[in-house]
Amino acid sequence: MRLLARLRARSDAAYDNTYHHKLRGRLWDALQDSPYEQHHDANRPVGFSYSNPFPPRDMAEGDQRTLLVAAPQEDLLASVAEDFIADRELNIGEMPFHIDELTSLSPDVGEPGTTGTIESGTGLLVRIPPWQADAYNIDTDSDEATFWRPKHSMEPLKAQLENNLDQKHELFCPEYLPGPSATEYELFTDYELIKTFAIPVEVSQGQELTYVLSKWRFGYTVRDDDHRRHLNLALDTGLGERNALGLGFINLTNHGE
């Protein structure tokens, strides 16, 4: 499920590529006094993910932008919508917006047999744990996780994406339903790397880390109802890590064939 917000710039502003922490703060403010507030500092996926305010370029007063917020929990999105309606000023750092319109969306990859494409809306964070480095012939002396790069091959990326989505499936889907790792097929049929890049991300107040991210175009064919659920869950929660910082947000760009 998704909440689409139509935004209008309240003044001229330069686009702020370090929006992640600031936008996350507004979303957490919206979840105060809700059942989700307890997960603010929890070491687990919260469930929500979000796009950047797009298109990402400098703006003049009155220019339009769009923001998408996604989550598997309808009541979480309802809390965000209530907050956006009560306070239509949305200040993302030095980018001041007015929320003109809110719309709910329910994207769906389609019934079994449907083919389509899912594309990264924001950079995807995939890290390989140090205890798995040898299995993928990664030479490292560090105790820290290794950021995935193309030189590491597709195998660790696929494994980490599946493991991460497994965790989200356990949190947000009924326990009797099989998760992604319980199937005999991969999430996607095609993995087209668009680019890799490094950006500084403010992960908490005053703490900035540099993340190596990647953007992808994934092709899929829906195998069965379980696979449909897994792909739709990824649309709701995002792929990879740190989705609550706006990383790993994905969009359907072509489906229904």
Q: How would you describe each model-predicted region?
A:
Residues 1-257:
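RNA-interacting cores
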